[in-house]
Every structure is written in structure tokens, then in C-alpha cells.
Amino acid sequence: MHLNAHRILPAAAMLTAVLLGVGCGTETSARIDPALPSMNSREVGSFMAGNFSNAAQAKDNPAFEDIRVHLRPIWVDRIDGQWLYVEQSLATSEDKPYRQRIYQVVDGNDADSVDCRMYALPGDALQYAGEWKVERPMRKLTADLLLPISGCTITLRKNEDSSWSGSTQPNECVPPASSGVSSMTSLKIDHDGFEVWDRTLNAEGQQVGGSTAGPYLFKRTAN
């Protein structure tokens, strides 16, 4: 759920796959794991599905851009996780998303974790703009055409308050030709919304990009 885009301020730069917000990593062919999702991954997938806005935060603090995020379940008959189409845009130009991704929510490596894998869309992603509005989004696209964003999976664990939180692994989400920088995304999500903080770090672990004012706070506006 990454928030960065060349059209937004450096403070918002890096999303993104929350929700919200990851635009980095090596793209290869999609890996499909034929395993029935657990109740944990189903819960995280249900928390992610919906429309979200950080309008209140942006109004109170000009360091944050006013952003809209739409996540829609897709391919609901598949058994290899919860699949969602993700579209992010500035509030002033919702018809021109700056980030479009596919998320695959699956069980993690142990019974208490859930992984959110990131995929890029093939070809010109803008051809899919607005798919979140249709009854059966992405029905003309198949999972084998997706481009995995390796190293940028977010691993989540459940908290005592029933929210889920986690992050990408340090130094693993590395953009091509990065010259020693990596991306770090932290996410906390529940039924009411999510917090996401995308940062770009140099080889010494110092932040060189992304929000310096803390995480973006997105509230659910519709299911």
C-alpha cells in the first residue's frame, strides 16, 4: 500500500499495497500456491476491501497529501488466497490513479501470520483505471499475467486489539538500479481503516525518502 508517485510531494513519496500503498522490486512470473486460505487471511482480506480516505489527516496537517484508496476483491472463485485490485489517486484527480496494484493475501510461514504479496499489472496499467467501480473487476485479466514485486511482501500478525500489523523485511524491497537504497513499508489495519508508512532508506538505514511526519491514516468511507 504504497503512496509514492512522482506527482506528489516528497513527504508522501517513497506507496505502496496497504493498503496502502509497493512500487519496487524485480518483476518475474506470478507464483500460485493452491492452498485454501485460513480464517486469518480471510479476515485481513476483508479488512482491506473497501474505499479509504485520509482527508481528515490532510486537512489537519499539510505535510500529508489528500489521497483516495480503493481496494476491490477480484477472482473470488480462486482458492489460492484473497485477491484484490488496488487503485490510489490524489483526491483532486481520482480518475487518474498514480498507483495500481494487485494484492494476494495468503497464509504466512506460521499459523499466526498473514502475507500480503504485491503484483504489478502487465502493460499499460491505466487501461484498468476505474476497475474498482465495476461489478466484476479484472475479469479479463488472469493471475499468470501478473508481475510479482519480489522482496516487498508485507507480513502481518494479529494484535490484542484485533488489528493486524507488520512490515516488509529490512533491505529486501529493493528497486531496480537503486544504488543502495531500499523501501520499508509498515502497515496496521483493522475494520475501520489502516495506517501505512512508506520510507526509503539508504545503505546505513537512514531515511532519505517518504513521509517524515509519520504514517498516513486512512479511514474507511465505504465497504
Identify the function of each model-found stretch.
Residues 21-23:
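C-terminal motif of bacterial Sec signal peptides marking the signal peptidase cleavage site
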Residues 2-12:
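Bacterial N-terminal signal peptides that target proteins for export
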Residues 58-62, 77-80:
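Secondary-structure boundary elements
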Residues 30-60, 66, 91-223:
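Calycin-type beta-barrel ligand-binding domains and close structural analogs
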Residues 25-27:
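Bacterial signal peptide processing site
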Residues 69-98:
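N-terminal glycine/threonine-rich, aromatic-flanked beta-hairpin/loop signature
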